[in-house]
Amino acid sequence: MQRTKEAVKASDGNLLGDPGRIPLSKRESIKWQRPRFTRQALMRCCLIKWILSSAAPQGSDSSDSELELSTVRHQPEGLDQLQAQTKFTKKELQSLYRGFKNECPTGLVDEDTFKLIYSQFFPQGDATTYAHFLFNAFDADGNGAIHFEDFVVGLSILLRGTVHEKLKWAFNLYDINKDGCITKEEMLAIMKSIYDMMGRHTYPILREDAPLEHVERFFQKMDRNQDGVVTIDEFLETCQKDENIMNSMQLFENVI
């Protein structure tokens, strides 16, 4: 039964409430399902917390409604266009932008700022390396800065995207050098960075070789032709057929 509880917790990413409240008769049959993203779930996201903590009180500021700010160096796209590109409502986009411009008046987030955000939310470990990888995943055009558009499009996929969209985004995160495939070295670097960020005071205590074991299991399932790399097709096909992998993918939502 302990294994079942852990599986439920992994599958919902702590977004569906306390698994202990699920009737015993139903726990064994629980399958992975798309999380229901409630307000509480959104508030568990580090980047959402960072932005909303800086958001000014709601008001009639017309600059928010049109996503305009004369002092910024980078002007974001219009509200209607961003709403069409994402799955956020106008009010959600306004709140996100309000916090974004308060924290980043230039309209851009650089990598040092991004690392600082994660160091604040994960003080028990070293979030520097993971923040670096995540920054590169959000920085869609690779120019060394995250625009508001990059920010909300990425969050929209992670929080409200389809399974296919989330998996493609995760593949891009793992594919560090962006050559279209994932190597064991790339996967190991990502896994080590996550373990480093979570710190040594996790429960249960993780062995030092845990990241390597995770990678080896990953490649045994993913690398269908045994050529030492995982392609996007192998990644998508295997993930969507393997419940355990899909469960583990949901854990990303706790460290975004």
UniProtKB/Swiss-Prot annotation:
Family matches, as SUPFAM superfamilies: EF-hand
BP-aspect Gene Ontology terms: apoptotic process; behavioral response to pain; negative regulation of DNA-templated transcription; negative regulation of transcription by RNA polymerase II; potassium ion transport; protein localization to plasma membrane; regulation of neuron apoptotic process; regulation of potassium ion transmembrane transport
GO molecular function: calcium ion binding; calcium-dependent protein binding; core promoter sequence-specific DNA binding; DNA binding; magnesium ion binding; potassium channel activity; potassium channel regulator activity; protein homodimerization activity
Per UniProt, location of the Glycyl lysine isopeptide (Lys-Gly) (interchain with G-Cter in SUMO1) cross-link in this chain: 26, 90
Chain residue ranges for the region called Interaction with KCND2: 243-256
GO cellular component terms attached to this protein's record: cytosol; endoplasmic reticulum; Golgi apparatus; nucleus; protein-DNA complex; voltage-gated potassium channel complex
Membrane topology of this protein: Lipid-anchor
Tissue spec. comment: Highly expressed in brain. Isoform 1 or isoform 4 (T+ forms) are expressed at equal levels with isoform 2 or isoform 3 (T- forms). Primarily detected in the layer V and deep layer VI of the cerebral cortex, the hippocampus, and the entire cerebellum. Expressed at low levels in testis. Also expressed in heart.
Binding site residues for Ca(2+) 1: 175, 177, 179, 181, 186
Post-translational modification: Palmitoylated. Palmitoylation enhances association with the plasma membrane. Proteolytically cleaved by caspase-3.
Residues holding Ca(2+) 2: 223, 225, 227, 234
Positions of region (Disordered): 1-22
PANTHER family assigned: CALCIUM BINDING PROTEINS, CALSENILIN
Miscellaneous information on this protein: Mice deficient for Csen show a significant decrease of amyloid-beta protein 40 and beta-amyloid protein 42, and display markedly reduced responses in models of acute thermal, mechanical, and visceral pain.
Described purpose of this protein according to its UniProt entry: Calcium-dependent transcriptional repressor that binds to the DRE element of genes including PDYN and FOS. Affinity for DNA is reduced upon binding to calcium and enhanced by binding to magnesium. Seems to be involved in nociception.
UniProt name for this protein: Calsenilin
